[in-house]
Swiss-Prot record:
Residues holding heme b: 262
Cited PROSITE patterns: PEROXIDASE_2, PEROXIDASE_4
Active site positions: 94
Biological processes, Gene Ontology terms: cellular response to hydrogen peroxide; hydrogen peroxide catabolic process
The keyword Signal appears for this protein: yes
Essential cofactor(s): heme b
Cross-link (Tryptophyl-tyrosyl-methioninium (Tyr-Met) (with W-93)): 221-247
Similarity comment text for this entry: Belongs to the peroxidase family. Peroxidase/catalase subfamily.
One GO CC term, this protein: cytosol
Top EC class, one word: oxidoreductase
PANTHER family in UniProt: CATALASE-PEROXIDASE (PTHR30555:SF6), HYDROPEROXIDASE I, BIFUNCTIONAL CATALASE-PEROXIDASE (PTHR30555)
Organism: Polynucleobacter asymbioticus (strain DSM 18221 / CIP 109841 / QLW-P1DMWA-1)
Name of the protein: Catalase-peroxidase
One Gene Ontology molecular-function label: metal ion binding
Length: 717
């Protein structure tokens, strides 16, 4: 029997009394970023198709309900000036604004604002209220609209309701069901930690570490009060230029988005931030997932506290106009503090009619305000030029903003093939990485015969297909084999693609493409499949690798070279290659690439084993090629990896000899990207499965399945 008052259940990993199993070994390789590919957390089941549900959606009715909601103020969280537009726009902005181009992670594509840590970032204070306001609509339309789509649609409809002609909107974002484990948000240990201390994201002359875009832990972009909270518009302008560039925005888009975001709505800081309760993830259970609750003062409407800044930016904060630039450029601004103590600017000698009215009482006029980021648009010479142009041409500003808003909210959706709905714009935009449709009606057998007779080696064919497809990122759906951009700048010159070998192989494929009416993109994949079929047959397995036709060939004019630079692989453990030595270990780099490609730990394992014995290492390296039958698709890598007749001896930072225990003779060489599959307990478990005598055929079949997944990852149709 247990003593009275003792806990009657075993403490799980979600309690303060227990750590996760791996917490005892913090330096051990953490495979959690690959395990999140599991579908067990998804309540919709494997047969659910969001695209099919979208086809049932009454878009017109949804838009009407959304517009009605915007002006239906609720007592528990009243709308400023009777319109929730500003709140919904901020929610959508902050959902999309977490995107960064370096790894394609973040952004609005998954509805991740519902989960930690994003739902509890200081910069997202009170956006939980926006999502709760949307709940009646989500409840009504159910599976036919994802949270991810609904949040972005809410912001877009809000702009339309206030007078902006938007550029378009696409449905198609699918929800996740748990926090993302793969996104590195920074190493700071406290919210809004200033730069320069332990774990700072900055080094040298304020160099922001990759892949980060935001300037502080818990912010979406820059600190509105100034760098590290110290007002200095010119320094803030430098931060803005870096941050927005890492969100794929140029100077004009930066000014447009900042001004357009501040044309409507207001900031809230009319009170004491100390009165706010904890963020949602730390809030008491009776708050039911709401955070920042104020039980000490009124805390809503004109008395709400969110960012700590207080006031509207424009005279008419519920309508789309050029009021932002009118106030910013036509008045001088002085530094002051909000009632909550935040640094902000107020205009000098402002006309009474230029002041916005109070959110609750239209007979009261209030002082507008600007942040350090707003004043930066006036003080920075380049931003000032753009601001002046927008000020003089509202139509141009509106058009530029509408396109920038569309880019901001759709950048992580990938190519246009993933778009859905009646408001998808017809115009092709270069940041969408456009790809023309490819031919489907050609004689595949004739093409295969020509490839086989071309003189290309199995390694040439498999390697070229892999290099073409490996650029795919499941984060923002960019890259991949479709488009055959491996033959265009910048990819054709990337070190990891071995340009000389690549040019030789592509010359053969281009000739075959012209003769047979097949795209180069399809030819590359078909060649890789042929190589695998040949290697499997040499091992005694007569298989056919699945092939899907229809890939198109992009041209250089469709390719933004600078935009594609971020896709360059700096390491590829599947080909046992590092461009140079990094602080991060080779096995961690392998995990990151695996996760971006949308692969599981099991798929990574079987692919590594197959790629090694096929002889596809970079530069023909023999490291990790644990077989006497290179070029034969066999499970030899795993058989020899798990063989206790061998010892592993380090010979350098990332090099090892595999030595026979009895003779001390070196049998093979390896890297950390090889050893990890025998060292890590989880990966070794997979390796042992494939090393078994009765799983030789399973290995071949699983390798082909994983290979096909990689080759087809970007075929969204």
């Amino acid at each position: 029997m247990t003593s009275k008052g003792m806990c009657p259940v075993a403490h799980g990993a979600n309690t303060e009394a227990s750590e996760t199993p791996m917490a005892w070994w913090p330096k051990a390789l953490n495979l959690d970023i690959l395990h999140q590919q599991d579908t067990k957390t998804n309540p919709m089941g494997s047969s659910f198709s969001y695209r099919d549900e979208l086809k049932k959606l009454d878009v017109g009715a949804l838009k009407k309900d959304m517009k009605d909601l915007l002006t239906n103020s609720q007592d528990w969280w009243p709308a400023d000036w009777g319109h929730y537009g500003g709140l919904m726009i901020r929610m959508a902005w902050h959902s999309a604004g977490s995107y960064r181009i370096a790894d394609g992670r973040g952004g609005a594509g998954t509805g991740n604002q519902r989960f930690a840590p994003i739902n509890s970032w200081p910069d997202n204070a009170n956006l939980d209220k926006a999502r709760r306001l949307l709940w009646p609509i989500k409840k009504k339309y159910g599976n036919k609209i994802s949270w991810a789509d609904l949040m972005i649609l809410a912001g877009t409809i809000a702009y339309e309701s206030m007078g902006l002609k938007t550029f378009g909107f696409s449905f198609g974002r699918e929800d996740i069901w748990h926090p993302e484990k793969d996104i590195y948000w920074g190493s700071e240990k406290e919210w809004l930690q200033k730069s320069g201390g332990k774990g700072s994201r900055y080094s040298g002359e304020r160099e922001l570490s990759n892949p980060l875009a935001a300037v502080m832990m818990g912010l979406i972009y820059v600190n509105p009060e100034g760098v590290d909270g110290k007002p200095d518009p010119l320094k803030t302008a430098q931060d803005m230029r870096v941050t927005f560039a890492r969100m794929a925005m140029n100077d004009e888009e930066t000014v447009a988005l900042t001004a357009g975001g501040h044309t409507v709505g207001k900031a809230h800081g009319n009170g004491n931030a100390a009165n706010l309760g904890p963020a949602p993830e730390a809030a008491p259970i009776d708050e039911q997932g709401l955070g920042w609750m104020n039980h000490k003062t009124r805390g809503i409407g004109r008395d709400a506290v969110t960012s700590g800044l207080e006031g509207a930016w424009t005279t008419h904060p519920t309508q789309w106009d050029n009021g932002y630039f009118n106030l910013l450029l036509n008045y001088d601004w002085k530094l002051t503090e909000s009632p909550a103590g935040a640094h902000q600017y107020e205009p000098i000698n402002i006309k009474e009619e230029d002041k916005p009215v109070d959110v609750e009482d239209a007979s009261i006029r209030c002082m507008p305000m600007m942040t350090d980021a707003d004043i930066a648009l006036k003080m920075d010479p380049e931003y000032r030029k753009i601001s002046e142009r927008f000020s003089k041409d509202q139509a141009y500003f509106s058009e530029t903003f509408a396109k920038a808003w569309f880019k901001l909210t759709h950048r992580d959706m990938g190519p246009k093939a993933r778009y859905f709905g009646p408001d998808v714009p017809k115009e092709e935009l270069i940041w969408q990485d456009p790809i023309p449709s490819g031919p489907k009606s050609y004689d595949i057998d004739a093409v295969k015969a020509k490839i086989k007779a071309s003189g290309l080696s199995m390694s040439d064919m498999v390697t070229t297909a892999w290099d073409s497809a490996r650029t795919f990122r499941g984060s923002d759906k960019r890259g991949g084999a479709n488009g055959a951009r491996i033959r265009l700048a910048p990819q054709k010159d990337w070190m990891g693609n071995e340009p000389e070998r690549l040019a030789r192989v592509l010359a053969v494929y281009e000739k075959i493409g012209k003769e047979c009416g097949i795209s180069i993109a399809d030819t590359i994949i078909l060649g890789g499949n042929i190589g695998i079929e040949q290697a499997a047959k040499a091992g005694g397995f007569d298989v056919k690798v699945p092939f899907t036709s229809g890939r198109g060939d992009a041209i250089q004019a469709m390719t933004d070279v600078e935009s594609f630079e971020v896709l360059e692989p700096l390491a590829d453990g599947f080909r046992n290659w590092l461009k140079e030595s990094y602080v991060v270990t080779p096995e961690e780099l392998l995990l990151d690439r695996t996760q971006l490609m949308g692969l599981t730990a099991q798929e990574m394992t079987v692919l590594i084993g197959g790629m090694r014995v096929l002889g596809t290492n970079y530069g023909g390296s023999k490291q990790g090629v644990f077989t006497e039958k290179e070029g034969v698709l066999s499970n030899d890598f795993f058989v020899n990896l798990t063989d206790m007749n061998y010892l592993w001896k380090p010979t350098g930072q990332n090099s090892y000899d595999i030595v026979e225990r009895n003779t001390e003779k070196t049998k093979w060489t390896a890297t950390r990207a090889d050893l990890v599959f025998g060292s890590n307990s989880i990966l070794r478990a997979y390796a042992e499965v494939y090393a078994q005598d009765d799983n030789k055929e399973k290995f071949v079949n699983d390798f082909i399945a994983a290979w096909t997944k990689v080759m087809n990852a970007d075929l969204f149709n």
